[in-house]
Amino acid sequence: MSQVILDLQLACEETSGLPDEALFQRWVDAVIPPFQEESELTIRLVDVAESHELNLTYRGKDKPTNVLSFPFEAPPGIEMPLLGDLIICRQVVEQEASEQGKPLEAHWAHMVVHGSLHLLGYDHIEDDEAEEMEGLETEIMLALGYEDPYISEKIAE
């Protein structure tokens, strides 16, 4: 049986109204086990200032972002279940959900799914990579009972 050990860190000033730990666990359990038997990851929920600082330091982008993924790379020959860390900015997620007319819980789920796929090595820099990753995100979100997170983009095409 596959198992995902989740370390949820609440590093944002306002913690009321956040999804509970059971939801975060459900979301990572929907993504990771098909790819990796045993896994450990940290999800850190932060405010704008920390997201902005990390995004500037590690991506060179001078603004906060919704989710940052920091994969863990074990030294050669050492097997470790540690996947890495997700840093999710509460205010950015809430603002995006509002602007995009998406249910807040669904957008939180999408950020966890999206970030977890990055930890597993997926990316969306090239078009073919983006198509594969977005397809997986959609499949997982539908399996979780949420709408396709890219439906508005598909309708616009």
Curated annotation (Swiss-Prot):
GO terms for biological process: rRNA processing. Its main location: cytoplasm. SUPFAM superfamilies: Metalloproteases ('zincins'), catalytic domain. InterPro entries: MetalPrtase_cat_dom_sf_prd, YbeY, YbeY_CS. Keywords: Cytoplasm, Endonuclease, Hydrolase, Metal-binding, Nuclease, Ribosome biogenesis, rRNA processing, Zinc. It is found in: Cytoplasm. GO terms for molecular function: metalloendopeptidase activity; RNA endonuclease activity; zinc ion binding. GO terms for cellular component: cytoplasm. Belongs to the endoribonuclease YbeY family. Single strand-specific metallo-endoribonuclease involved in late-stage 70S ribosome quality control and in maturation of the 3' terminus of the 16S rRNA. This is Endoribonuclease YbeY. It comes from Klebsiella pneumoniae subsp. pneumoniae (strain ATCC 700721 / MGH 78578). The gene is ybeY.
